[in-house]
Amino acid sequence: SRGVRVYAFEPEASNYNILCQNIRLNNMGNRITAYCAGNLDYDGFSVLNIAQDRDVGPGGSCHTVEEEKNFDLTNMKVTFKQGINTVMLDTFCKQMNIIPDHIKMDVDGLEHRVINGGVESIQKAKTVIIELNTNLKEHNDAVSKMKSLGFKLDETQVKQALRKGGTFLNVGEHLFYK
């Protein structure tokens, strides 16, 4: 009723299949369009690296586009490379004539590269939610980049969102707003 449209990107084939099934089962095909592609800082062909120690079945995560890196940017032992297309957010938004209101980004480590490929589109958004790892220089630089694009960040929200222990220590959603 509010004219909301969602454009989702899921490069991993099994997860993309589940995403499309859920869109169909919930009769949301008129509002949600899913693309089996990865976002990065260039348009073209690449690979999705699937790690040995990660779940490779439907719902699995922590796979990365192009770079053989884990979510924390440490080296990944890759067991499978799935061919994929990559698209920059700016290319997608221009080609589809989209001005995004809200963007959610969770690409398991390479968020800084997605931001670099989407500066024009990100600047037009009202809010951007990005899962970032505060242990990483690249992700702290991404926070600075978002601020340079005119976004604000609620440090209290970030502090509450950060994981307090385990594998994903200091990883959490950052809500940027104007």
Provide a role label for each language-model segment:
Residues 1-178:
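Phosphate/nucleotide-binding beta-alpha loop and adjacent structural elements of enzyme active sites
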